[in-house]
Amino acid sequence: MRLFIAIRLSDEMRDALVHAQNELYDCGVRGRFTAEENLHLTLAFLGEVPDAEPVMDALSTLSFAPFELGLEGLGCFGDLWWAGLKESAALEALARKVRHALAERELPFDRKRFSPHITLIRNASGKLPGLQLRPASMTVSAVSLMRSDRGKHGMVYTELGAVEARR
């Protein structure tokens, strides 16, 4: 099964992101827009993993306090367009803890540098307009283990488990 570890977004954050997607579409941008229910922040991508239990065991060792996360700016990595996040030492620390827990158990994950973003559009065409994101923030209080399956109408993400914030 294809797995990743993510922060699931609040309704306020998803609403602001869908508003941005609609504005981009209205500006003539085309591509594969991320479905509202699939908007998330990836902390670590594992890819194909035969068993989710060792991953949940690794996540269960995490200790982190709830923290605030806010949207800030739009950008792109080639034809992948994303929403950015306000700089957050707590988010960076959480990503490091997640990746350390996986590495400690020799679980496979993409070791590219953590670059916090929320994917809005894949295979985007057009020019990135100078739109402003609606202000939105949320309290991060859990980390989720997610499974990714290909469905009839795109990817379907299912939460397999979550770890709540604790000090």
How would you name each of these model-derived features?
Residues 1-167:
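Histidine-dependent nucleotide/RNA phosphoesterase domain, centered on the 2H-phosphoesterase fold
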